[in-house]
Amino acid sequence: MIHYIIDGNNLIGKDSFLNKLQRKEKQSSREKLVLILDRYFINKKANVTLHFDGYPNETIRSNKARVIYSENRTADEKIKYQIEHLKSNKNTTVVTSDNNLAQFAKVCGCKVVASEEFLKIIQDSKSGDDEEKRIKEISNQEILKLFKAK
């Protein structure tokens, strides 16, 4: 099973909507990111750890991700600590665009996906879902036409 370790603040910073939202309402941007990740990982066999800087304002519940706050350390330090203490890093993917953290993860044997690339993957998966829904709708409409024709 793949384990994703996600640099939450970095990911938020690379998404224009979440980045704008974070400037106004930090908690809301974090909640929205968790919702996006829950939807993306819903049918995937993966462990997800999402790291944020600072202390939690309110608890964020997630169906798929374990949310960790760095408290009096940086999220990068917590992520590095987690990577160092994993039994095996070969099935670990770190999502970040922080060069220092990405380099550390690579040296430790983790796969690294840039935040921008990960957002594109999520976006592409949403497009596929929309196309699938449209195909099903068209098929249902065609079936209804066939039954009405008789």
List the predicted regions and their residue ranges.
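Nuclease catalytic cores that cleave nucleic-acid phosphodiester bonds
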Residues: 2-5, 9-150
